[in-house]
């Protein structure tokens, strides 16, 4: 028998709600958190011209830990071995570092083109993650492709320059995409193979293990000293960072809820669509002129979303294996499942 894990989001029970309500609640939390995050980043990075990504992420980590503590989470609630989260954090920091490093070789439009394709490698890699082995129907790949193409068209219509490609930059951003794809699927696999895993555990352990990974590049690049001096001259920046971290915390927990309930690929589609929504809102709020290319991009994004939402097969539940782990009776089945679990953790 398949046992459903009870899920909740900031005290709101999700397990006893229909799927559409679960989706709406989690997506709303994600959009709220990251729209606030975008406003704060715009202020800190563009208005104040601060570019201390490692340091700001480091500060954000401590805010996360405090908020998790307020949620009542303690180490007694951890059900997975810490080595699982070492892998997770190493991949996360590697992706972050490669993305930041690629900016030295790729201009903004080129990086956006590559990062917008994230949902495709997430779907492809899902078939190779131990404990997951997820397969998707053809129409979902088409949906993802339309969404990606539409977002690229919309973004490049607003670009002040053409994409500038460099082989080193392409290799770095490709590595970041592969790590991003592995990260989302690994998180889903952890939720799948151990349904007792909570979103708070995932965020707590990833943060605790990830903080030392952040400290090394901060010291080696000297960013920690430059950031400390700059923020000492503008101490109100810490207030902005704390507010941003609180909003992003809501977004992060919502994303983990989406991964646990709907899978990594669906979550990647939502995070990709969020970029399009953010861009569209900036045009509506600041009344920027929309060109024909903007319209084409929006049309493709809408087609991708609609194609994803429309059921294409009456046998939909059978096309993707159920996420919760099911123990197979018999020695061979147990051994196979144990091998899957070992290779994951």
From Swiss-Prot:
Topology versus the membrane, per the UniProt entry? Multi-pass membrane protein
Residues in coiled coil:
none
Gene Ontology CC terms, in alphabetical order: Golgi membrane
Parts of the chain that traverse the membrane: 20-40, 50-70, 112-132, 137-157, 164-184, 202-222, 245-265, 294-314
Matching entries from InterPro entries are given as: SCL35B1-4/HUT1
Query: Which tissues express it?
Result: Mostly expressed in roots, and, to a lower extent, in seedlings, shoots, leaves and flowers.
Q: State any GO BP term from the record.
A: UDP-galactose transmembrane transport
Main location per the UniProt record: Golgi
Keywords for this entry?
Antiport, Golgi apparatus, Membrane, Sugar transport, Transmembrane, Transmembrane helix, Transport
Positions of region (Disordered): 326-345
Q: What does this protein do?
A: Sugar transporter involved in the transport of UDP-galactose form the cytoplasm into the Golgi apparatus.
Question: What does the sequence similarity comment in the record state about its family?
Answer: Belongs to the nucleotide-sugar transporter family. UDP-galactose:UMP antiporter (TC 2.A.7.11) subfamily.
Which named protein is this? Answer: UDP-galactose/UDP-glucose transporter 2
């Amino acid at each position: 028998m398949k046992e459903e894990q009870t899920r909740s989001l900031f005290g709101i029970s999700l397990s006893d709600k229909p799927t559409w309500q679960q989706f709406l609640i989690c997506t709303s939390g994600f959009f709220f958190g990251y729209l606030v995050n975008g406003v704060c980043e715009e202020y800190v990075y563009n208005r104040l011209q601060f570019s201390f990504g490692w340091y700001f992420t480091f500060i954000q980590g401590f805010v996360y830990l405090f908020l998790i503590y307020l949620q009542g989470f303690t180490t007694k609630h951890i059900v997975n071995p810490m080595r699982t989260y070492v892998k997770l954090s190493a991949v996360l920091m590697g992706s972050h570092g490669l993305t930041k490093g690629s900016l030295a070789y790729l201009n903004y439009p080129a990086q956006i083109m590559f990062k917008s394709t994230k949902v495709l490698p997430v779907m492809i890699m899902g078939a190779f993650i131990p404990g997951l082995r997820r397969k998707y129907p053809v129409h979902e790949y088409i949906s993802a492709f339309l969404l990606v193409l539409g977002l690229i068209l919309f973004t490049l219509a607003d670009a002040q320059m053409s994409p500038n490609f460099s082989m080193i930059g392409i290799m770095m951003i490709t590595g970041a995409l592969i790590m991003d794809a592995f990260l989302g699927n690994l998180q889903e696999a952890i939720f799948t193979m151990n349904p007792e895993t909570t979103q708070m555990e995932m965020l707590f352990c990833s943060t605790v293990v990830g903080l030392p990974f952040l400290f090394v590049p901060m010291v080696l690049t000297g960013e920690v000293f430059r950031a400390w001096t700059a923020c000492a001259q503008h101490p109100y920046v810490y207030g902005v960072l704390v507010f941003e971290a609180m909003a992003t915390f809501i977004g992060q927990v919502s994303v983990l809820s989406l991964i646990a309930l709907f899978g990594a690929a669906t979550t990647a589609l939502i995070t990709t669509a969020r970029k399009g929504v953010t861009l569209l809102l900036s045009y509506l709020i600041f009344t920027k002129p929309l060109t024909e290319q903007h319209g084409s991009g929006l049309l493709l994004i809408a087609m991708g979303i609609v194609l994803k939402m429309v059921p294409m097969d009456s046998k939909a539940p059978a096309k993707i294996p159920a996420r919760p782990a099911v123990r197979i009776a018999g020695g061979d089945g147990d051994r196979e499942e144990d091998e899957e679990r070992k290779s994951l953790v």
